[in-house]
């Protein structure tokens, strides 16, 4: 009896479980295979499979040979689901190296800006923007290293930029906000379709920017402060911290008032804020008071093993009503001043990651389960020779591979000839 032939559906089912790099190799087999693997059906199937195995993405930044250079290395490791059921001691996960990212003759980020959130992530792509000198804003695929240089902008003093994704039109957009008292205009750029051009955009409230951005269901959120601009903000009553909400699709701004400095996260598809008892506004310390942030955190942020955390989840956007929760836990290796909030897993664990990686010390991520009020630490191994000295680490949760990202034509080769990007005036 002859064996039954393998159906194309079974082949696609098997291949949808492979890494994206492996799938891309099959494009070269024949035009028919390239057509099959480039079809919307297979891309959706692959994304569905990939979404069931999210990973932690690590962007490790190291000071380059020149004073301003910053060299990036991208790794990923399995994102553990319900790690508490496996062990009460330290677990171990191995990081997979993807790419060293330092395009020739291209300054992409001033090294000393790293502590002031100079990197963003959205649906498989990394956005790195420069804040000083002639640093270039760009978007890259952290798995392959393919990237696109965005048109540069003249900015007065320090500007801030954010990265978001519109799930309806499936478009990536970068938002650049100017310094509130300086010349120029805030702008937005759409990536993935048409020419790369910054378009002028207007925000009705002047505000200082106080946090990195988080994009949830097509809305980009970040923390702002109107304290210094109450006289020019018209009828808006607020004179303190607020959450700025930018709709990526409509490109309109709305605002949510909050009482104090906080950290923003995506909690199971809802906006949530985290309050630490001893949290500090690093922008206020550095830019207004001239205080060294690292030194302040070292000397003033609680170094005790007992941690207190408040989580507010936005239950009603229109009424601005919050569901409020408070937690306390103890762990001898978890120190507030050494970690940053990486995000929240699909099952609701809040993930914390060490902010720096040192070759002489273990590198940990921590999974906090609010329902159990318990913390599980996981040692990440595998950075190896990439980390020969203390480096800054940005960690992102829920990283999945998407074949649509691989097909973006504006992502060039790893080291294309450098073309000077267009500059925009400050008008």
UniProtKB/Swiss-Prot annotation:
<protein>
    <recommendedName>
        <fullName>F-box protein At2g16450</fullName>
    </recommendedName>
</protein>
<feature type="domain" description="F-box">
    <location>
        <begin position="1"/>
        <end position="45"/>
    </location>
</feature>
<dbReference type="InterPro" id="IPR013187">
    <property type="entry name" value="F-box-assoc_dom_typ3"/>
</dbReference>
<dbReference type="Pfam" id="PF08268">
    <property type="entry name" value="FBA_3"/>
</dbReference>
<dbReference type="InterPro" id="IPR036047">
    <property type="entry name" value="F-box-like_dom_sf"/>
</dbReference>
<dbReference type="InterPro" id="IPR001810">
    <property type="entry name" value="F-box_dom"/>
</dbReference>
<dbReference type="Pfam" id="PF00646">
    <property type="entry name" value="F-box"/>
</dbReference>
<dbReference type="InterPro" id="IPR017451">
    <property type="entry name" value="F-box-assoc_interact_dom"/>
</dbReference>
């Amino acid at each position: 009896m002859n064996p039954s032939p393998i159906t194309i559906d079974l082949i696609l089912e098997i291949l949808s479980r492979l890494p994206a790099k492996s799938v891309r190799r099959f494009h070269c087999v024949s035009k028919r295979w390239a057509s099959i693997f480039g079809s919307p059906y297979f891309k959706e199937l692959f994304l569905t499979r990939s979404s069931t195995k999210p990973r932690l993405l690590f962007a490790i930044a190291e000071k380059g040979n020149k004073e301003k250079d910053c060299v990036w290395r991208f790794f990923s490791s399995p994102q553990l689901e319900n790690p508490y059921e496996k062990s009460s001691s330290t677990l171990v996960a191995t990081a997979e190296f993807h790419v060293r990212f330092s395009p020739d003759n291209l300054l992409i980020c001033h090294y000393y800006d790293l502590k002031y959130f100079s990197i963003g992530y959205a649906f498989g792509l990394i956005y790195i923007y420069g804040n000083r000198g002639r640093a270039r804003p760009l978007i890259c695929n952290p798995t392959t290293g393919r990237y696109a240089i965005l048109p540069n902008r003249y900015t007065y003093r320090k500007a801030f930029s954010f990265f978001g994704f519109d799930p309806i039109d499936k478009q990536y957009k970068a938002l650049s906000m100017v310094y509130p008292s300086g010349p120029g205009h805030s702008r937005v750029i759409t990536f993935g379709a048409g020419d790369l051009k910054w378009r002028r955009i207007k925000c009705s409230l002047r505000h200082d920017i106080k946090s990195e951005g988080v994009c949830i269901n097509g809305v980009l959120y970040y923390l702002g402060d109107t304290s210094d601009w109450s006289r020019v903000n018209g009828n808006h009553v607020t004179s303190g911290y607020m959450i700025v909400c930018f709709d990526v699709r409509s490109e309109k701004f709305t605002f949510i008032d909050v009482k104090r400095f906080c950290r923003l996260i995506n909690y199971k598809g809802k906006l949530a804020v985290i309050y630490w008892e001893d949290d500090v506004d690093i922008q206020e310390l550095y830019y207004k008071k001239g205080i060294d942030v690292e030194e302040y955190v070292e000397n003033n942020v609680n170094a005790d093993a007992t941690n207190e955390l408040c989580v507010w989840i936005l239950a009603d956007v229109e009424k601005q009503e919050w569901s409020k929760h408070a937690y306390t836990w103890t762990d001898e290796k978890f120190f507030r001043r050494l970690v940053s909030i990486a995000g929240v897993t699909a099952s609701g664990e809040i993930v914390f990651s060490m902010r720096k990686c040192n070759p002489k010390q273990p590198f940990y991520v921590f999974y906090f389960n609010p329902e159990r009020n318990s913390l599980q630490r996981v040692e990440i191994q595998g950075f190896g020779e990439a980390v020969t000295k203390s480096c800054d680490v940005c960690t992102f949760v829920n990283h999945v591979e998407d074949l649509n990202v691989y097909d973006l034509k504006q992502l060039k080769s790893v080291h294309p000839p450098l073309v000077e990007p267009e500059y925009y005036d400050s008008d």
